[in-house]
Amino acid sequence: MPELIHIERQLGLIDQYAPALTDHERVGFELGWDYAHYRVALPARYAQEASPLRDGVRAGEATFGVRTLAATRHVRKWLQLRLHAWLRGRSVELVQITPNYLQQLEVSHCPITRVPLSSATLETSDASIDRVRNDAGYAAGNLAAMSTKANHAKGAHGFRSALQCVQRIEAEQLPGLDGLTAEQWARVAVLCSFVEPLSHDEASALPLLVLPPNRLRLFNPVQALQAFVSQQLLAPGWSQRVSRFEELLPGKNVQRDFKAFFMALLPRVLEGSRLYEQHTARWAIEDAWRAPLVQQRWAQFARQLDAAQCEALLVKAAARKLGAGTRLQPHTDTAATDGWNLATRGYVPHRSPGGLQEMRQAQLC
C-alpha cells in the first residue's frame, strides 16, 4: 500500500503541472519529471528543445529541489529506455517495468550471438533491451537483453520472418543476413516463437535453440514444458527431479516416450558442458537440441499431449517443487499481455487529454 500511495501522490503533483496534455505529451512530461526526481541530466540535444519532456524536468526541479533520489546504473538504464521509447511513440508499462525489473533481465552473454555483453562502449556488443514481440510495447514478459548487433538485425522480425531468413541463407548458401548467421537467425526465430501463439503441433516441432530469457512470458504451453524439462539440467539433483516429473505423466506410453527423449538429450548436454559456467551450460542444452534425434523424440512425446495437459503438468510440477530454481507463474490470456498495447501495435494509445490519467487510476485500483 505505501508504494501505491506514493504513486498516487506523485500523479497528483504531476496533474498540477500538466492537467491537459495528450497521452504522448503526458508520457514525456512524466519522463522529464523522473529525470528531475533522480537528478539525471537530459541528453544535450533535448535539454534546450521546447517539449513536454523539458517541461517535466523543470516542473520536477521546482518540486524536488535538492531532495532527489539516487540514480543507480539501473535507474539510468530505465530512464534511457523510456526516452528511447518516447521519441518513437512506443509505450512503456510503468507499473511493472522498473529499474529492478530491468536488473533481472541482465545476462553476461548475448543469447543470439553469444558474445560477452559490454556496456556503454558504443560497440555492437553493448547490451540492449529488445521488445521480443515487435507489435507490442515495452511491457513485462516482452523484454529480453541482447547485444545491439542482434537487436538491430532482429528489428521488426517475428517468428516466421526470422525463419525465412534462415531458409534464404541456406538456399542461397549465404554467409549470413544483416550480420547474423543462419544459426543465429534460428535462435531469433525460436525466441520470437515464445511470445507468439502457435498451434500445439507447430510449437511441438520447434527445437529449443535458445532457452527463454528470465521473465519472458511463454505463450505456448508445450514450449514452457520443453524449457522446464531442459532447464532441469542446469541445477544439481536433476536425476531425482526428472524421475519425479516422469511419474506425473499420463500413461506408460507417454512415460516411455519421455524417457526416450530425455536419454537422447542428456548425453549431448553432458558432452557439451565440460565448463561449469552458467552460460556454457545453457549453450550445451541449446546445442543439444540441434540434433535431429532429440527433436524427433520430443515431438513424438509432446504430440501425445495437448496444450491443456502441458499446462496442467507444469502446475503439478511446480506444486511438487520440481522447478530447479525456475519460477513458474501461470497467466490468463488477458493478464499475459497486460500493458502490451497490442491494439495499437505497441505505440502509445491516442486518447484525449486526461485519458492516460484515467487509465493510470484504473491500474491503481
Model-predicted regions and their roles:
Residues P2-L79:
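N-terminal alpha-helical interaction blocks
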Residues W33, H37, G56-V57, T63, ...:
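Catalytic cores of phosphodiester-bond-cleaving enzymes
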Residues R45, F64, T68, P175-G179, ...:
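DEDD superfamily 3′-5′ metal-dependent exonuclease/proofreading module
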Residues R88-L102, E106-T148, A153-G158:
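Histidine-centered nuclease catalytic patch
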Residues V132-A144, H152-S199:
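Polybasic, low-complexity binding patches
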Residues A203-C365:
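C-terminal, charged low-complexity interaction regions
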